Amino acid sequence: MKKLFGILCVLAAAVLAGCTPSNNEPQDEAKIGYDGGVFVLCEGTFSAGNSSLYHYHPERKEVTANVFNKANNAKLGDTAQSLYMYNGLLFVVVNNSGVVFALDRTTGEVKGMFDNLVSPRFVAIDGTGTKGYISQMYTSEVVTFDPRTLQRTGSITLEGIAGSEQMVVWGDKLFIASWSNDHKITVLNTNTDQQIATFEVGVQPYSMVLDKNDTLWVVCDGGNEYSQLPEGVTMEAPSLWKISAETHEATKVFDFEAGGWFRSRLAINGSGDTLYFIYDAVWAIDIATGNLPAEPLITIEGYGQYGIGIDPVSEDIYIADAKDYASNGEVLRYSSEGELIDTFEVGLMPSKFAFFAE
């Protein structure tokens, strides 16, 4: 009880600091519960404090808006960044609020939180389930925590790295992308939390997934005119890298057109054999061939596509469409063959997905 009270006190402090109570949000009399489906994270407008979390149940075609607000009587915060599902918990990273919430995925209630972070980006948990990591954009420190107690345990300072982005666990290795103004992947040993390797990829690596063959796929956006790149590193075209998780050697690099951009991060299906991303359309790469197909899987009108997720069981494809980036967005659900199944409205700037089956 004391622990829960402490968590709620910290949550209250965060609320007073910027996540103000949502008095205008109606509260359901019945307790809301979630038993499957997908959570959709909506980024909201930077500095407006209007991030939101939605839930969709595909079998019942039910949409629940403002999951966090309804469960905790507080707003989620400013500029929600990512989701991570683990052992009955849904970790929600809220970048500009400097906080990570651990929610009960069946109720949306806060079970723990980590605050006073420096622009947090992603969460990863090691294979033993005893160590958690939080990446941060504007500092070389990666925060560590115990997923069992939801208590912070310390931090790791990355040598030669200004900030960290998406992370991937493979065995006792933690791969950390350094997106902002850099071109490196850092590797930690999760048993010792020691930095064991750093290798170069394209400019500004920001998204990674691991396939069933222990291959690490990395998207690099190539930088832009605002990037403050290290000496000797210049802006380049976006690229997709295929890298051995064991040796850290690149076995293939796909170069895209200069001036182009990836509209989503990478996603992979539950069997780990098909890679998905949005460039100018939705593309799917069969890892057996490792080749970019001649035609995209799905073509969508407009320029609002902002995120992609793959249901690990049904392999349905979820596309987050931010529309005009100023009004409510939409999620489009497709079959793995690229046929549209249904659509549903969500909040402002939808971008990330987390599935119950994960």
PLM regions and their residue ranges:
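Positively charged n-region of N-terminal signal peptides that target proteins for export
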Residues: 1-4
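Sec-dependent N-terminal signal peptides
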Residues: 6-11
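C-terminal motif of bacterial Sec signal peptides marking the signal peptidase cleavage site
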Residues: 15-18
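Predominantly soluble domains enriched in secretory-pathway, periplasmic, or organellar proteins
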Residues: 20-358
